[in-house]
Regions:
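Long, basic N-terminal domains or extensions that often function
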Residues: 1-136
């Protein structure tokens, strides 16, 4: 029998997440600043919380934490992520960001319908364009 002592989950996460971030392949990626990290967009914050406590680590000069921001124009600035179960509502409320494609599609379609109704216009559906906008 070989017995291996268990490791603390915080230590495992602090080791694994930076490796996952650095190893994640994006078909189109960019570098910014003086770092070497390539990512789909400039990485500004890394939220990593376990049992209400920040799991500390760093990736390319970015330290993990418990704060995030929403939309850069419409959001209300940084806010603490309290629980995973209400992260989506926090991001939507304080951040003015819809986390899922379905939620974004719903908001976009409602906006299209409202503008068309007010202007007496008819929207000619273009699913490809809609999906592109949902992905922005």
């Amino acid at each position: 029998v070989i017995e291996t002592p268990g490791r603390d989950a915080t230590d495992i996460i602090a080791e694994a997440v930076p490796a996952i971030i650095r190893g994640f392949h994006w078909p189109k990626s960019m570098r910014w600043g003086t770092g070497d990290l390539r990512w789909v967009r400039p990485l500004q914050r890394i939220v990593c919380v376990l049992d209400g406590k920040v799991v500390p680590f760093e990736v390319d000069g970015i330290s993990s934490g418990d704060e995030t921001e929403g939309h850069r124009v419409h959001g209300r600035g940084p806010f603490k992520v309290t629980f995973r179960k209400n992260y989506e509502s926090q991001l939507s409320g304080a951040g003015h960001v819809k986390l899922t494609r379905d939620a974004r599609r719903e908001v976009i379609l409602a906006g299209i319908e409202k503008v068309c109704a007010e202007a007496g216009l008819e929207w000619i559906e273009d699913k490809g364009l809609l999906e592109e906008v949902v992905g922005l």
